[in-house]
């Protein structure tokens, strides 16, 4: 690689020296409560990913979030000032950018600089800000040179960088076994700011340093075909794994020429470094991604050539927060910047500016909280580095040098339809390659080509240049080898035939049609539930039967009349390779009373499963955590010995090791014999690991050396099994759960992190054992020793257990008989306790149902009857709401609004209990009540609602708002009488709803009413006059939407009552 190109010239250093003295005299700054962000980005040219038209909306969204969150810079105002990094031609300039930065520093003394994004523009500005001790934050400037913190001490990159691309390629080389040679080509185009040069520079330096391999590089001009010819002559002598940075059209041209030259066969692979996915049409959508397609008559050849091509891009975030952010970003860009933003990977740049700015604001907030100032650039920058942050682009991690860990995607062509799709993703945070489920890299030979030809690039391997043997020598050699081969084959042929016959017979195969769900499984499936005794991953659970027996179940079924345990396998299909067939054969060969018997396996998609012996007593973990089961030490030693015997058989057999030994994989049969399950069949292990808390909880038994491996062996190791046994031994001894640490309440994740870290002394469970168990504690410590070589084998463990368990070596039968008597007594108490709990829960459920639905409707549902909709000839409906509620809500916090409505409707609910009415619903500030249904009350419904309305109005006059005690709550009420239809709507959260024009008219009476008055329709007035005693006042004709002019009345009060409207 040629020497690094300095992104800024010496004239800028002189400019810096001339401008610094007056800058040092500058006293103006970011005053308390006012933080200034200086933006140095292209303001006119929107072709840059970091142009202000793209980044500006993202900054606006970030500042809006800061303003909305009280925990970020409380009492401060954040403002932005703009400076252009473009010259007069609209191109990023290494002169315009630093001048703009100096002007902004002089005029505004900002607390932070945002941008530039272009490499040559960012270099001088980064040096200036380091000298000024002002942080610089950018999602551009991806070149390798910005990682030199001697020059760019306060530069933080929240976006992708080319050095991280090198990390991805290094991981890819390790995965594919390319550890000797690579070739990198980069295109040069006038005016392109040497984008490809800086990209290949980061790739070149990082891959060479990470892998210590030979990396060659070549530059070519995109518009000069003679350069393409020169490249094609050089490629066969320089590399087989080739990385190319160029435009999509140039890459296609180069691939077509390579096809003509015979370089697109199985010996070559070409990676197009198209980081923004321009050749893939960008964006999201169902359209096929065919970068080879142009419609120019060469598509057939181009598709053939692209079979040897892969494409590397940034990973497109697909989290919901990012998708919602894009919607807001596009809308804001169009509304405020008159810019139409298209879909594409380029949108990750403004999103990264958004996340970076929020991270900076968080760092400033923390600095202020610790007594610092916004001008303490070094402290603020250090708070941003080596830190994780959840942003709209997902999980954002800034490393210790201020660079974001970047995710990448590898695209490959589907040979069936020619479309490119993602087959591999790289997680920059964990530095792991994650294959996309159901997809794989396409290789002509079925495997990756070697990075160096078999005989070297120039046939320099001496093995390929030996002189040819004579014909006689060849014949003699062939004859000797043939004779030797015949003797060897004759010796093994019979044994091999027998083995092949056994493999071909497939005695292990189970047809899914022969597997019948057990009665227990059918009952659980029909009930829509699954019962388990422990929530920590056990495959077995326990329940209480009507016979008073403690039954234990897994996913069970009947196969050939026998009850078996069924373990579902999370795979789409199982390829029956010889490796898999041998695994199945080894499982059938296992015959040991302390290992669950392998019944067979079903490989018929989608019902892929493993059938094993069913042990009805559940797992060891279940038994240890069930406090109702008493375990004396004789019984515990018996269980421990069973584990040792089973593991001793595994370690001495063809399976060699377990790899997943834990208490939930130790099950107990009906005779209380412990058996180990879930061993062998590594090809049947689930592909997709569980996430979150569960994955850490399942690793609590895993040895530290296996935890530190990126891809530990599926079978684990024998020393790892001994470590797992030590953890189980502590579970059995203390019965306090897995990995119990006295005095500490740690999550599984915290435990795994401390074990993996390798503390001194090693972090292990507690050993708070009784005095007579000291020898058992010493055995545990030896089993979970940090050095695998120091752990004893199971043969030695067996001898050790025999030494200090001699006094408990009597027959276990007497102990089992007494224990079964204890179970019978305990189960009677459990049945009574759970019956009472059931009755209490039934009472609570009925009370809740009566609150949701009318009593008569609820009783129908309890009897299993269908609630039919019912028509009512005459009911009276009440509507009310709060005048000015919208304005009141805007001036109050959400909690104050919730408190207000809760106080008000609690008051209302207490009032309406005194009347023959039914509360239908409350929505926001609206309150709806009806009388006359579901139980008819003749014509009394109007009187009941009128009296209730007067009572509510009286209660409102004395009601006080907690956070505004001086204000009077203004209630507006409307009442109407007429026919309705009522019924229960929905299955989930069913509601008793009213339908009909009467409901709409009652709502119109409320909306056309006045505050603190009761508005009546003429229909309600007519019913009230039948009873007399109510004071009414004619309001007149009111224009109502959809009704025309309607004559209405005010309800003033009831004669003989103190309540008045």
From Swiss-Prot:
Subcellular location: Membrane
Induction summary: Expression is chronologically prohibited with ages.
Stretches in topological domain Cytoplasmic: 495-1061
Molecular function as annotated in GO: ATP binding; G protein-coupled peptide receptor activity; GTP binding; guanylate cyclase activity; hormone binding; natriuretic peptide receptor activity; peptide hormone binding; peptide receptor activity
Lyase among keywords: yes
Entry keyword set: cGMP biosynthesis, Chloride, Disulfide bond, Glycoprotein, GTP-binding, Lyase, Membrane, Nucleotide-binding, Phosphoprotein, Receptor, Signal, Transmembrane, Transmembrane helix, Vasoactive
CDD domains in the record: CHD, PBP1_NPR_A, PK_GC-A_B
Residue intervals of the Guanylate cyclase domain: 876-1006
Protein name: Atrial natriuretic peptide receptor 1
Organism: Homo sapiens
Gene this protein is translated from: NPR1
């Amino acid at each position: 690689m040629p020497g690094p190109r300095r992104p800024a010239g010496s004239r800028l250093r002189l400019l810096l020296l001339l401008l610094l003295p007056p800058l040092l005299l500058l006293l103006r700054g970011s005053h308390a409560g006012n933080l200034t962000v200086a933006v140095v980005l292209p303001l006119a040219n929107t072709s840059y990913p970091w142009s202000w038209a793209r980044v500006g909306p993202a900054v606006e969204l970030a500042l809006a979030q800061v303003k909305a969150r009280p925990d970020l810079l409380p009492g401060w105002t954040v403002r932005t000032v703009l400076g252009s990094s473009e010259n007069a031609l609209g191109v990023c300039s290494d002169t315009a950018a630093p001048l703009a930065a100096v002007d902004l520093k002089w005029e505004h003394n900002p607390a932070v600089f945002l941008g530039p994004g272009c490499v040559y523009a960012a270099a001088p500005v980064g040096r200036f800000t380091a000298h000024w001790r002002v942080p610089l934050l950018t999602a551009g400037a991806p070149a390798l040179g910005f990682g030199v913190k001697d020059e760019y001490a306060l530069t933080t990159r929240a976006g992708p960088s080319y050095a991280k691309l090198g990390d991805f390629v290094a991981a890819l080389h390790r995965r594919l076994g390319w550890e000797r040679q690579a070739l990198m080509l980069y295109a040069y185009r006038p005016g392109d700011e040497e984008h490809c040069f800086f990209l290949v520079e980061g790739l070149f330096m990082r891959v060479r340093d990470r892998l210590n391999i030979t990396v060659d590089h070549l530059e070519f001009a995109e518009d000069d075909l003679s350069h393409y010819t020169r490249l094609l002559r050089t490629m066969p002598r320089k590399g087989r794994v080739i990385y190319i940075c160029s435009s999509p059209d140039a890459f296609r041209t180069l691939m077509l020429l390579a096809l003509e030259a015979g370089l697109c066969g199985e010996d070559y692979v070409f990676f197009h470094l198209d980081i923004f996915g321009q050749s893939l049409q960008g964006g999201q959508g169902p359209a096929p991604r065919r970068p080879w397609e142009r419609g120019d008559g060469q598509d057939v050849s181009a598709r053939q050539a692209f079979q040897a091509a892969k494409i590397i891009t940034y990973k497109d975030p697909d989290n919901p927060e990012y998708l919602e952010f894009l919607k807001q970003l596009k809308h804001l860009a169009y509304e405020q910047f008159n810019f139409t933003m298209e879909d594409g990977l380029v949108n990750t740049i403004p999103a990264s500016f958004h996340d970076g700015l929020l991270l900076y604001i968080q760092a400033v907030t923390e600095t202020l909280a610790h007594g610092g100032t916004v001008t303490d650039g070094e402290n603020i920058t250090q708070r941003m580095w080596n830190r994780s942050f959840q942003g709209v682009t997902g999980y954002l991690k800034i490393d210790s040098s201020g660079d974001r860990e970047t995710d990448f995607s590898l695209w490959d062509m589907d040979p069936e339809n020619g479309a490119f799709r993602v087959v591999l993703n790289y997680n920059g945070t964990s530095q792991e390659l994650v294959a996309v489920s159901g997809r794989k890299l396409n290789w002509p030979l079925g495997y990756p080509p070697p990075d160096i030809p078999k005989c070297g690039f120039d046939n320099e391997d001496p093995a390929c240049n030996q002189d040819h043997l004579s014909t006689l020598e060849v014949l003699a050699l062939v004859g000797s080898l043939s004779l030797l081969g015949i003797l060897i084959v004759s010796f093994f042929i019979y044994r091999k035939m027998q083995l092949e016959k056994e493999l071909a017979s497939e005695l292990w195969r189970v047809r899914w049609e022969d597997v019948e769900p057990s009665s227990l499984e059918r009952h659980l499936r029909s009930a829509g539930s699954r019962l388990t005794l422990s929530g920590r991953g056990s495959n077995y659970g326990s329940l209480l039967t009507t016979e008073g027996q403690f039954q234990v179940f897994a996913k069970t079924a009947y196969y050939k009349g026998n009850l078996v345990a069924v373990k579902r396998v999370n795979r789409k299909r199982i390829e029956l390779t010889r490796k898999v067939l041998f695994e199945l054969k080894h499982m059938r060969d296992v015959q040991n009373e302390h290992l669950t018997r392998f019944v067979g396996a079903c490989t018929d998609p989608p019902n892929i499963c493993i059938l094993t012996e069913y042990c009805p007593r559940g797992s060891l973990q279940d038994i240890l955590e069930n406090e109702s089961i008493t375990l004396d030490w004789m019984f515990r030693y018996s269980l421990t010995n069973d584990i040792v015997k089973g593991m001793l058989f595994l370690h001495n057999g063809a399976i060699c090791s377990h790899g997943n030994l834990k208490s939930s994989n130790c099950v107990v049969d009906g005779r209380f014999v412990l058996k180990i399950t879930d061993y062998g069949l590594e090809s049947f292990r689930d592909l997709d690991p569980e996430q979150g808390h569960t994955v850490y909880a399942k690793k609590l038994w895993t040895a530290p050396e296996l935890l530190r491996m990126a891809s530990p062996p599926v079978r684990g190791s024998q020393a790892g099994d001994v470590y797992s046994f030590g953890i189980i031994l502590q579970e059995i001894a203390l019965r306090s759960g897995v990995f119990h640490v006295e005095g500490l309440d740690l999550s599984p994740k915290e435990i795994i992190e401390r074990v993996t870290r390798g503390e001194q002394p090693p972090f292990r469970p507690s050993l708070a054992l009784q005095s007579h168990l000291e020898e058992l504690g010493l055995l545990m410590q030896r089993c979970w020793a940090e050095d695998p070589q120091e752990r004893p084998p199971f043969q030695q463990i067996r001898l050790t257990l025999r030494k200090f368990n001699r006094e408990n070596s009597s027959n276990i039968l007497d102990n089992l008989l007494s224990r079964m008597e204890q179970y019978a007594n305990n189960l009677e108490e459990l049945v009574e306790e759970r019956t009472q709990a059931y009755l209490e829960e039934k009472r609570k459920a009925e009370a809740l149902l009566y609150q949701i639905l009318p009593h008569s409707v609820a009783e129908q549902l309890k009897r299993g009857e269908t609630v039919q909709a019912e028509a009512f000839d005459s009911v009276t409906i009440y509507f009310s709401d709060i005048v000015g509620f919208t304005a009141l809500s805007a001036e109050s916090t959400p909690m104050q609004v919730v408190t207000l409505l809760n106080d008000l409707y609690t008051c209302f609910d207490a009032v309406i209990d005194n009347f023959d009415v039914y509360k239908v619903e409350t929505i926001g500030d609206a309150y709806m009540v009806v009388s006359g249904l579901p139980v008819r009350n003749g014509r009394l419904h109007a009187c009941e609602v009128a009296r209730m309305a007067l009572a509510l109005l009286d209660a409102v006059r004395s009601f006080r708002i907690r956070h505004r005690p001086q204000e009077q709550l203004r209630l507006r009420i409307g009442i109407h009488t007429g026919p309705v239809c009522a019924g229960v709507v929905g299955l989930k959260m069913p509601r008793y709803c009213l339908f009909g024009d009467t409901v709409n008219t009652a709502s119109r009476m409320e909306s056309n009413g006045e505050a603190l008055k009761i508005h009546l329709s003429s229909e309600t007035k007519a019913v009230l006059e039948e009873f007399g005693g109510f004071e009414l006042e004619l309001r007149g004709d009111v224009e109502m939407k959809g009704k025309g002019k309607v004559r209405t009345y005010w309800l003033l009060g009831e004669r003989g009552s103190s309540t008045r409207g």
